[in-house]
Amino acid sequence: MAFFNVFKAVLCAYFISVVFGHGITLKPHQRECFYENLRNNDQMSVTYQTNVGGDQLVSMSIYNPAGQIMHQEVPNSMAQYSFTVKNPGKYMYCFYNDALDGESKEVLFNVHGVIYISDEDLDANNPLLGKVRQLHDTISKVKHEQEYFVARERIHRNTAESTNDRVKWWSILQTVILVSVCVFQIFYLKRLFEVKRVV
């Protein structure tokens, strides 16, 4: 029984995976930064998508512990960047609203990290652990893709509803204009055929 408890503890430690889902609102020209303490061979992935606001273009930058830019994303409505840590320390990732349109933007982002534990810490002869780790990684990737598609679906649904509203109001306006023109033509033609008598 003690073997199973130790096995569970080792398995949990081996597959520590951290996932965060966040949403922030960036005002024009605002920069919002977040920090992660990472060790050698840890893996980190940042995915973001703008949901609401103007042209929906946001920049993302990732800085290493020395404060140097590792990656800079051009203004985009959605992007993803993954990397494996070579230098341990505090990594910073920032989102910036360039505000080319002067509007606030809502940014949804996920941070996914896999904490690396070396094979020396585990029983390297156990093939089951390798398969479980593979399965865990695959399930995590599927989960993140699903979160990404949910966010995209929300944006597309909002766009479709907005388009439907515009089409509805345009149709109502066309109907009002058509009825007005018909009424005008009826009265105009009626006046044209009236007999004018001289008394």
UniProtKB/Swiss-Prot annotation:
Compartment(s) where it occurs, according to its Swiss-Prot or TrEMBL record: Endoplasmic reticulum membrane; Golgi apparatus membrane
Its topology with respect to the membrane?
Answer: Single-pass type I membrane protein
User: Where does the UniProt entry say this protein principally localizes?
Assistant: endoplasmic reticulum
UniProt keywords, alphabetically:
Endoplasmic reticulum, ER-Golgi transport, Golgi apparatus, Membrane, Protein transport, Signal, Transmembrane, Transmembrane helix, Transport
Q: What SMART domains would the database entry show?
A: EMP24_GP25L (SM01190)
**Which family does this protein fall into?**
Belongs to the EMP24/GP25L family.
Report what the protein is called: Endosomal protein P24B
